[in-house]
A protein has these predicted regions:
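Non-catalytic helical/linker scaffolds that mediate oligomerization, partner binding
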Residues: 1-500
Length: 500
């Protein structure tokens, strides 16, 4: 059995070589990127099980990210395997401003009172911490007395005790000993802030990524379906309507609007880092299970992300609780699990991918016994859906080694994946765009071949591609799914065939 759960690995300096130096060595950043050596490292990640690489546009400029994408293309050639490219937007966020003078950080004690300035374009001092808000918004009127302000992923908590309308400042009380450094993330839980759906920087980043031929966009801090629709409009305007959009759910508003967001997006990324700050932490696993269940029912992509193997940023082995976390995400029904800092700037990127692949593969063998997916509740709303359901029944009741789905758009393979058949799904596509769009779908192994000329050719091509893949051998039973006649645009045929 192949690994059916996909792995998203975030790229960064952890796998990049500069002037013969590894990340963390003196003078690393002053050296030029060694593309060939870096490509070898990334190829190793592919061989260990990485299916999609995430380019985090919260860090680095277009030149750096573009060079990184070029290196991944080199790595594809070295590994002899295609991967997906995912752009993760910076999104609308709040950060602490730069400090006056040479200060890098300020330390605070529990019970201290300081001020937080919401007026834009000023620098921070020890007594007045200024906020840099996406879209240059002044959030003074949006935050009520009694609200909590969390800095640097919640490492320091501040409580608003009063407001100074004249200066546009909050008076806050420090809730725990801690440090505030420049340009650290700020969260204000249970507060609706009227961010623009798409910041100017995100617009520029998305257009750049589309020019580079990316396959997926993860849209940060999605609150409503409109946020997804704005990105979709850019993709369609630039002739990139095929790019798949993942809505990152990171706050209460996104959770409240989850049904309409799922309908608008191609998938959901459950970004548990910011979510765990924006909502009560004990609700994060509840929301994870709820969202995955809804996404599964819609036949879309579910990606579970953030802190999955966090310990492996610094240590060669995961904790038992991290192993359980990854395992349970698979049992919940996730299509993909994601590595962030572990593969981007950690000490053990290769080991992190290998560990995640091992857990994913073990968990998928127990889906039938412990999995939460109940396909009997899915609606059969189309001929293709009926065929996809029949494919699962066939793999459950017969000795079927492989499902072969001939698909122009990829939709046939996606629907079959939705039902989680008991066999791998070989998606036979006719162009690389469709092939790469399937890199996140559970159980799908996408390949490219020439389009068959006739219906008879179609089934012969399916068998030949299956044999060539090494997934079956002579005498094995396969299920072939296709649309007849060729090019009809719909799936209406399922044929069980013994490989000759």
């Amino acid at each position: 059995m192949n690994k059916r759960v996909k792995i998203v690995a975030t790229l960064g300096p952890a796998v990049e070589i500069r002037g013969g130096k590894k990340f963390g060595e003196d003078g690393y950043w002053s050296e030029k990127l060694d593309c060939e050596a870096s490509a070898k490292n990334i190829a190793q990640l592919i061989k260990e099980g990485a299916n999609v690489f995430r380019f985090n546009f919260s860090h680095g400029d277009h030149a750096e990210q573009g060079e990184r994408m070029d290196v991944v293309r080199m790595a594809e050639d070295l590994a002899g395997q295609k991967v997906g490219f995912l752009l993760d937007t910076k999104g609308p966020e709040i950060r602490t401003e730069l400090f006056e003078g040479d200060a890098k950080e300020y330390a605070y004690k529990t019970g201290e009172q300081i001020r937080v300035a919401t007026k834009q374009g000023i620098k921070s001092t020890r007594d007045v911490i200024a906020l840099n808000v996406a879209g240059a918004l002044d959030v003074f009127d949006d935050v009520e007395v009694g609200k909590q302000v969390l800095v640097d992923d919640g490492k320091l908590g501040l409580r608003v005790v009063d407001k100074d309308a004249e200066k546009r400042e909050f008076i806050v009380e420090v809730e725990n000993d801690g440090i505030i450094a420049k340009q650290k993330g700020v969260n204000i839980p249970n507060t609706k802030i009227p961010f623009p759906a798409l910041a100017e920087r995100d617009n520029d980043d998305i257009r750049f990524g589309l020019e580079q031929g990316l396959n997926f966009i993860a849209i940060s801090f999605v609150r409503t379906a409109k946020d997804v629709q704005e990105v979709r409009a850019i993709c369609e305007e630039t002739g990139n309507g095929h790019v798949k959009l993942l809505a990152k759910i990171e706050n209460q508003q996104g959770i409240e609007n989850i049904d309409s967001i799922i309908e608008a997006a191609d998938g959901i990324m459950i970004a548990r880092g910011d979510m765990g700050i924006e909502v009560p932490f004990e609700m994060v696993p509840v929301y994870q299970k709820m969202i995955i269940t809804k996404v599964n029912a819609a036949g879309k992509i579910a990606v579970t992300a953030t802190n999955m193997l966090e310990t492996m940023t610094d240590k060669p082995r995961a904790t038992r609780s991290e192993v359980s976390d990854v395992f349970n995400a698979v049992i919940d029904g996730t299509d993909a699990t994601m590595l962030s800092g572990e593969s981007a700037n950690g000490k053990y990127p290769v080991e992190s991918v290998r560990t995640m692949a091992t857990i994913d593969k073990n968990a998928q063998t127990l889906l039938k016994e412990y999995g939460r997916l109940d396909s009997s509740t899915f609606g059969r709303s189309s001929k293709t859906e009926v065929v996809a359901s029949a494919v699962k029944d066939a793999t459950n009741s017969m000795d079927i080694k492989l499902v072969v789905a001939l698909t122009e758009s990829g939709n046939t393979a996606r629907l079959i994946s939705k039902y989680r058949p008991e066999a791998d799904i070989l998606a036979v596509t006719f162009d690389e765009i469709t092939q790469k769009s399937l890199m996140l779908n559970w159980g799908v192994i996408p390949v490219v071949t020439e389009k068959p000329a006739s219906t008879d050719d179609m089934f012969d091509v399916a068998e030949k591609v299956a044999l060539h893949s090494g997934l079956v051998e002579s005498g094995d039973n396969i299920v072939i799914v296709a649309g007849v006649p060729v090019g009809t645009g719909g799936t209406n045929t399922m044929r069980i065939r013994t490989v000759k």
